[in-house]
Amino acid sequence: MASVLSRRLGKRSLLGARVLGPSASEGPSAAPPSEPLLEGAAPQPFTTSDDTPCQEQPKEVLKAPSTSGLQQVAFQPGQKVYVWYGGQECTGLVEQHSWMEGQVTVWLLEQKLQVCCRVEEVWLAELQGPCPQAPPLEPGAQALAYRPVSRNIDVPKRKSDAVEMDEMMAAMVLTSLSCSPVVQSPPGTEANFSASRAACDPWKESGDISDSGSSTTSGHWSGSSGVSTPSPPHPQASPKYLGDAFGSPQTDHGFETDPDPFLLDEPAPRKRKNSVKVMYKCLWPNCGKVLRSIVGIKRHVKALHLGDTVDSDQFKREEDFYYTEVQLKEESAAAAAAAAAGTPVPGTPTSEPAPTPSMTGLPLSALPPPLHKAQSSGPEHPGPESSLPSGALSKSAPGSFWHIQADHAYQALPSFQIPVSPHIYTSVSWAAAPSAACSLSPVRSRSLSFSEPQQPAPAMKSHLIVTSPPRAQSGARKARGEAKKCRKVYGIEHRDQWCTACRWKKACQRFLD
């Protein structure tokens, strides 16, 4: 323990330090050798030598920090010793040991020169330990020469397999990322959907918004802001992953490998609780083909409808605007697949309800109940081709006008107005779903018009519950100039009868409202 402390703390530690050792700075008046030594250190017998001045020099057992417990003796001329010189251990012969000054003159054999060292920096060859340590650093010119050797520092060597383990871990991370369903996309197709955004902000189901931010012939809005919004990146929008946005969330978050998306007979995805399957329907007039895969519907639009024009730069990604998503139940999905293949399936309904995503503009309690299907205007088409859901607009849609349409039939009911303030009116129109069997939330479009109302809103037959009362329609407060005040009651000529507040042109305190 003592050697460890002396090696770590060096000259700051009192353990092993010389107490009464002579030095050159102390001058000729140094302590005699008969002074008491450290506690626990016993004086050694005097050394016998023919040299008279060296006979009275005893050996002292003083532990110096540089020798790690080795005995420090009175050196005799001709003894083989080791010294630290130039940052390395050198072999030399003792020429003279000045006990009063505490210095030893040593002749270095390899360097062929004579040096004068302190006693702490010299040790005998026969007393050398297996690993002699460097002397402690002293401030001054010699401090640069005596530097600790790196072999005395316990530094663990870096193993060669550590780098390989890092590379292995990096490879495993990259492999896991490449196998993740968030990154997967089939070759030869472009990114069209974002499954992470689809859960909270679904894109239009009739097709993606192109990079120019404009619409196509599908009858939806066109952005007039001029700001282009590129389509979001997607893990290819196969029904396996797009169903997560509209179906119940899965509990399995492990890595899955998607089967070949080019095969139209790919295995059905994991059955969800609501039994809803996402299909893709062609929007080309008089077509209405329904397929399972987004790749198949794109290939169908390119091959049958667009032709060779889709390869040009002008019509690039034009097929994205000619298909939409349709959510069907499991039994109706089989019927749609059979209808696409040309084989009729008995016992299946001919039309399927179109689920419409509910918007969060107003709570459902604040909206009137949807009207019957018979009141809707516009033609309807039988078959699963006619049921098209209305999709939510993308983030590039104009914020001042929200409009959602259900298919090309433009099925809209008579709109009504909700007075919110004298200057802002909210128009809400309902569009019923194509099928009466569907009991989902109806589609509504809300437009805000900032204009003066021509007449108050007519009374509604249906009960309308408005959650927030109109702010600007409080009848308790009288209009400006109608309230009684002293100026109107007494007149200007009888100013002496006014109250003090009216005299100072403040609110009248005598005739309160």
Swiss-Prot record:
Residues 17-56, 204-269, 335-394 are annotated as: Disordered. InterPro entries: CR1/CR2-DNA-binding_regulator, DUF4772, Znf_C2H2_type. Its main location: cytoplasm. It is found in: Cytoplasm; Nucleus. Pfam families: DUF4772. The modification Phosphoserine is found at residues 248, 376, 449. Keywords: Cytoplasm, DNA-binding, Metal-binding, Nucleus, Phosphoprotein, Transcription, Transcription regulation, Zinc, Zinc-finger. Interacts with repression-mediating E2 binding site P2 of human papillomavirus type 8 (HPV8). This is Zinc finger protein 395. It comes from Homo sapiens (Human).
